């Protein structure tokens, strides 16, 4: 009820743009888990009640929405969140201040890749073929950007705290 009332009061542009007001502030997911396919549920079974740990989330997307690591962050874990979407780390800095939040692209070698951005940011990616297949009447590529990508080992060499082990 509150969500529908707010939707009537807040201009449409805030509901339809990537990183919109809705996704940032109102989309509180049911239950304690956040991932899209239950990855955090499976990981919680592996790590049990462990209240400290370290994760690396490549393609982190959002600190809560479809997040594989939000559940663990709320338990006291820390980690590195990596996402290529320009501007994506602003919301991570707000909701995940204990984490290392990096707006970077990951690739098998240092190279420039074309990043395909959709009106639904969960669909963003680097594959032209997959991006073209994902386009529908609802989901559209809104922009492309050439982004310098780095191997994960280079990113970890530069940003992983000295002596820090990675749980997942």
Map each language-model feature to its residues.
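Phosphate/nucleotide-binding beta-alpha loop and adjacent structural elements of enzyme active sites
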Residues: 1-168
């Amino acid at each position: 009820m509150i969500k529908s009332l707010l939707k009537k009061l807040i201009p449409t542009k805030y509901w339809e743009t990537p990183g919109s007001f809705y996704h940032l502030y109102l989309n509180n997911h049911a239950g304690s888990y956040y991932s899209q396919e239950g990855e955090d549920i499976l990981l919680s079974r592996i790590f049990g009640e462990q209240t400290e740990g370290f994760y690396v989330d490549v393609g982190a997307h959002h600190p809560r929405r479809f997040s594989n690591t939000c559940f663990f962050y709320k338990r006291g874990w820390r980690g590195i969140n990596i996402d290529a979407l320009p501007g994506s780390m602003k919301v991570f800095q707000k909701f995940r201040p204990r984490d290392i939040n990096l707006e970077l692209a990951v690739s098998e070698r240092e190279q420039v890749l074309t990043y395909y951005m959709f009106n639904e940011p969960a669909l963003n990616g680097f594959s032209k073929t997959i991006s073209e297949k994902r386009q529908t009447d609802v989901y559209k590529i809104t922009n492309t950007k050439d982004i310098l990508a780095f191997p994960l080992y280079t990113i970890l060499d530069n940003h992983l705290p000295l002596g820090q082990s990675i749980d997942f």
